[in-house]
Amino acid sequence: AENFYYVILYLMVMIGMFSFIIVAILVSTVKSKRREHSNDPYHQYIVEDWQEKYKSQILHFEEAKATIHEN
């Protein structure tokens, strides 16, 4: 009977540690996602300017493709 008590105690400690780790991972993930959608300048640059940068790169690529170099 005493052995069975230690088995239950061991299982409860292991489940508690596992639960603590899972909760810590979830909380850190939620915090990082919340911080990601803030109004910091880097995030605003990504949200607003990436399409303009992409279009300018495509136009520059098209210009470079049409260039003829003579020897």
Swiss-Prot record:
Record topological domains on the Cytoplasmic side: 28-71
Sorted UniProt keywords: Cell membrane, Ion channel, Ion transport, Membrane, Potassium, Potassium channel, Potassium transport, Transmembrane, Transmembrane helix, Transport, Voltage-gated channel
Main location: membrane
Protein location: Cell membrane; Apical cell membrane
Swiss-Prot/TrEMBL GO biological process terms: negative regulation of delayed rectifier potassium channel activity; potassium ion export across plasma membrane; regulation of heart rate by cardiac conduction; regulation of ventricular cardiac muscle cell membrane repolarization
A GO MF term: potassium channel regulator activity
Tissue expr: Detected in heart; expression is highest in the SA node and the right atrium, and barely detectable in the ventricle.
Superkingdom classification of source: Eukaryota
GO cellular component: apical plasma membrane; plasma membrane; voltage-gated potassium channel complex
Subunit structure as annotated in this protein's UniProt entry: Interacts with KCNB1. Associates with KCNH2/ERG1. May associate with KCNQ2 and KCNQ3. Associates with HCN1 and probably HCN2. Heteromultimer with KCNC2. Interacts with KCNC2. Interacts with KCNQ1; forms a heterooligomer complex that targets to the membrane raft and leading to currents with an apparently instantaneous activation, a rapid deactivation process and a linear current-voltage relationship and decreases the amplitude of the outward current.
Annotated function: Ancillary protein that functions as a regulatory subunit of the voltage-gated potassium (Kv) channel complex composed of pore-forming and potassium-conducting alpha subunits and of regulatory beta subunits. KCNE2 beta subunit modulates the gating kinetics and enhances stability of the channel complex. Alters the gating of the delayed rectifier Kv channel containing KCNB1 alpha subunit. Associates with KCNH2/HERG alpha subunit Kv channel to form the rapidly activating component of the delayed rectifying potassium current (IKr) in heart.
Listed PANTHER family: POTASSIUM VOLTAGE-GATED CHANNEL SUBFAMILY E MEMBER 1, 3, POTASSIUM VOLTAGE-GATED CHANNEL SUBFAMILY E MEMBER 2
The protein's name: Potassium voltage-gated channel subfamily E member 2
